[in-house]
Amino acid sequence: MKNILKVFNTMILALIIIIATFSNTANAADSGTLNYEVYKYNTNDTSIANDYFNKPAKYIKKNGKLYVQITVNHSHWITGMSIEGHKERIISKNTAKDERTSEFEVSKLNGKIDGKIDVYIDEKVNGKPFKYDHHYNITYKFNGPSDVAGANAPGKDDKNSASGSDKGSDGATTGQSESNSSNKDKVENPQTNAGTPAYIYAIPVASLALLIAITLFVRKKSKGNVE
């Protein structure tokens, strides 16, 4: 009887370890960090806005959808952002550092993704009065894992084109304008999401069934009903 109980306890401990290991593996695969760059819209040229984006970003997969969390500095200059038509959801702010972290729903973690940014500056920059008010398209180049798929579909943005020339407070063009376009590029079809692997759900069920079987066996053995 003592030997049976030892085997029973050992198997229970093993099941707990297996379940914990698979759960941690699944969670680890559903979040992480990714490096990225901000390009001028529909080009491979680095945008002037790139320096205002802290790297790396963080990605999360939840409920079958992909999200990236991006932190910007000079936060009060950046009055609005969107990625694939999905507006930012601010999740944290650091007033002292003038930073904020925003979450966006995305269709993939690797490759180019279109976004928009609104910038408004009306203060002294390098000791001189400076005024800058612009809304323009940009392209994010994500360098994250390509094997993490989501079911996300690009959202619809109410503005498809950027505004006119960037101008400083003296009315002269600043030379910092981004490439503007009124035509939307086609967005790649997101990969079909397979959801959480089936074995993640199967393991607890199989473990429970095994636990019940062992319990019944031990009870029968203690009563002398096992042949």
UniProtKB/Swiss-Prot annotation:
* Propiece span(s): 193-227
Q: Which SMART domains match?
A: NEAT (SM00725)
What's the protein here called?
A: Iron-regulated surface determinant protein C
- Which positions does UniProt annotate for heme binding? S47, I48, Y132, Y136
The residue ranges of the NEAT domain are: 29-150
Q: Which Pfam families match?
A: NEAT (PF05031)
Instruction: Give residues where Pentaglycyl murein peptidoglycan amidated threonine occurs.
Output: T192
Stretches for region Disordered: 149-191
* GO cellular component terms listed in the entry, alphabetical order: extracellular region; peptidoglycan-based cell wall
Instruction: Spell out the subunit comment.
Output: Monomer. Interacts with IsdA.
